[in-house]
């Protein structure tokens, strides 16, 4: 999942990994994983804005290796607060639709929402 998430963040073509991801995750689990990953980055960005520094021990409960910490920081700051808002809104609406609409073709719906997510990240 991490390499898939990185491809989404780096605005690379993630279609090749999407099939593998859809085979291993159900649609709601994938939405929740994306939400959790973006939320972790959002927490890092907000913490840095409020405190002027990043303390991974306080944020995540552990101190990641320096390279991982640097990667998380750069990912967190690559997005604007407004983009985070749009991402969370999209993911929550997607999860709601998946749970409440029994006539939905889930795989196609998820792909269309991932394309919307990619569009949000490119802005």
Task: Cite the ranges covered by each PLM segment.
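C-terminal alpha-helical interaction modules of replication/initiation AAA+ assemblies
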Residues: 1-10, 14-123
